[in-house]
Design a protein with these regions (language model features):
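Conserved, structured C-terminal
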Residues: 1-3, 122-123, 323
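FAD-binding subdomain of flavoenzyme oxidoreductases
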Residues: 1-101, 329-331
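A short, flexible low-complexity segment enriched in Lys/Arg and Gly/Pro that occurs
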Residues: 15-34, 80, 215, 249-258, ...
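Short, well-ordered loop/turn and helix-capping segments at boundaries between secondary-structure elements
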Residues: 46, 60, 88-91, 163, ...
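Short beta-alpha connecting loops at secondary-structure transitions
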Residues: 70-72, 198, 283-289
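C-terminal substrate-recognition/cap domain of FAD-linked oxidoreductases
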Residues: 75, 83-262, 266, 270
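Activity-critical C-terminal alpha-helical subdomain
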Residues: 281-331
């Protein structure tokens, strides 16, 4: 989830699993590592109920030390310098933040309103420093772990961010973000009552290609008049990061479906992955073969034939396993 930059994604936390499948039970062992052929855990993770029903899982656990958690936020003059700072942080090998989120200019302007920054002394200082609306970018996050570790990582974060033109804006913005982190999404239901639709699509790419992906996908979304497009990264690695594209616009269901497909086409043509962690499901299935390749998709289908020869588990297009050829959207 939101702490994956330090702890890893959900699949990185799995030690063992147990599934019930039409051909029998599948169990793996809860040891930290093994080398006994291809990893069955990884074969099953992400299968979205198409290979079996997950009935038990053993996960890694970590020490809970909230008293040591330290918060930070920085404002950058623009997106390129903010991305350069994020890249240097993840590649610095001095430790990683737990929550690590970087918003592009449009999302930053919305965040200043949502988190109560607009009109505060922080906002005034940012403006005096020449950080302009429509250009400035907000980075926020937390560091978890031993007290000495969290203090050291925060010091290094400050050093890197300042070297890229970032201004430290305290941990107060992060606290504001935490306060609304799990309630803000519920605005979607209220807005739908007025015909305003919100959706989130996410992808992943490497650092060199990230600016191109951001520009390409955002350009398509903004080509529709009166459409808000907020973008952020929140799962970062030494090699690259994910990008979340959140769009808000007034449209009906038919127009939404067509627009949504266009965004996925833009993600595919940008060279990014079709998903970083949301999964493929049925909605994104038409793009899967174009993402991973025909031979690679046949591996999934071979596993499906083994575990579920009668196709009773989650049929109807999940993972493109029984998707009609005419429904494929290839690059």
């Amino acid at each position: 989830g939101q702490n994956s930059t330090y702890y890893g994604k959900a699949e990185d936390l799995v030690l063992s699993q147990e599934y019930i499948t039409p051909v029998g039970d599948i169990r793996t062992v809860d040891v930290p590592a093994y080398a006994t052929g291809p990893n069955i855990d990884q074969m099953m993770i992400g299968s979205e109920g198409a290979f079996g029903i997950l009935v038990a899982v053993t996960l890694k656990v970590f020490r809970h030390q909230p008293e040591n958690t330290t918060r930070f936020s920085f404002i950058f003059p623009d997106w390129p310098r903010a991305c350069a700072a994020a890249r240097e942080i993840t590649q610095g090998e001095f430790g990683l933040p737990s929550v690590f989120r970087l918003s592009d200019p449009e999302e930053t302007d919305v965040a200043f309103k949502l988190y109560g920054v607009e009109g505060t002394p922080i906002d005034s200082i940012v403006s005096l420093r020449g950080f302009k609306k429509g250009e400035r970018c907000l980075m926020l996050g937390t560091v978890d772990g031993d007290r000495a570790y969290t203090s050291m990582v925060k010091r290094r974060l400050k050093r890197v961010c300042r070297a890229h033109g970032g201004m430290y804006s305290t941990g107060l913005i992060t606290k504001k973000w935490e306060h609304g982190r799990f309630t803000d999404p519920y605005m979607r239901e209220d807005l739908q009552d007025y015909g305003v639709l919100i959706d989130t699509l996410e992808c992943a790419t490497n650092w060199d290609d990230l600016p191109k992906v951001h520009e390409h996908v955002r350009a398509f979304i903004k080509s529709r008049p009166k459409t808000v497009c907020m973008t952020h990264m929140s799962h970062c690695y030494p090699q690259g990061a994910n990008l979340y594209f959140i769009f808000i616009a007034k449209m009906d269901a038919e127009e939404f479906h067509e627009f949504h497909q266009g965004i996925l086409d833009a993600v595919q043509s940008s060279g990014a992955t079709m998903s970083h962690h949301h999964g493929i499901g049925k909605m994104t299935a038409p793009w899967l073969e174009g993402q991973i390749g025909k031979n690679e998709l046949e591996v999934f289908r071979a596993l499906k034939r083994h575990f579920d020869p009668k196709n009773v588990l989650n049929p109807g297009g999940t993972l493109a396993l029984d998707l009609p050829d005419d429904d494929r959207r290839l690059p």
